[in-house]
Amino acid sequence: MTSRPETKIPDEITSPYPIIGAGTIESGFGRGSAELGIPTANIPVTSELNKLETGIYYGWCRLVPRNQECAAKQRSDGKKVYFNNGTKLADDELETFPMAMSIGWNPFYNNETKTAEVHIIHKFRENFYGADLRYAVMGHIRPELNYTTKEALIADINKDIEITKDALSKPSYEKYRTKI
């Protein structure tokens, strides 16, 4: 594993941030929750996200339910996933929350496609596959790394989450909470 570089969060937001966007939540591989205990919401890699270096980013996000028929869909591993389009989200789950976003290939899992995986720093009661996720990427934490153990990967993700919370507590970042 390449060693984790030190993360320095600037007091003020610097270009190219913020990057404001949205995407509809897709089913992923089911690893975030099941294997790592850190659920993620997968969204399409937009042209704006694709311009960023692979790595881990911090920012704000919020879920927006979609008025669409609910349906079960089959994931790439054969498991059926229920898309409720966010219609089961409670009012307190529609607020803006901090997020840590991974953009890249997930070398630990040898992914063949580039993904954008968002860990929303909030405990949700229901899944929300099919909902829209609006986001503001506020900055970069670190490059994408490979790991020799799942435990090392989990430890680094948890560190990313703490860095995200600390960064977004700065006044210059906090003001963007209401802009998405």
From Swiss-Prot:
GO terms for cellular component: mitochondrion. GO terms for biological process: FMN biosynthetic process; riboflavin biosynthetic process. Coiled coil: none annotated. InterPro entries: Riboflavin_kinase, Riboflavin_kinase_bac/euk, Riboflavin_kinase_dom_sf. Pathway: Cofactor biosynthesis; FMN biosynthesis; FMN from riboflavin (ATP route): step 1/1. The keyword 4Fe-4S does not apply. Zinc or magnesium. Its EC number is 2.7.1.26. It is an enzyme of class 2 (transferase). Mg(2+) binds at T40, N42. It catalyses: riboflavin + ATP = FMN + ADP + H(+). Keywords: ATP-binding, Flavoprotein, FMN, Kinase, Magnesium, Metal-binding, Nucleotide-binding, Transferase, Zinc. Its cofactor is Zn(2+); Mg(2+). Catalyzes the phosphorylation of riboflavin (vitamin B2) to form flavin mononucleotide (FMN) coenzyme. This is Riboflavin kinase. It comes from Meyerozyma guilliermondii (strain ATCC 6260 / CBS 566 / DSM 6381 / JCM 1539 / NBRC 10279 / NRRL Y-324). The gene is FMN1.
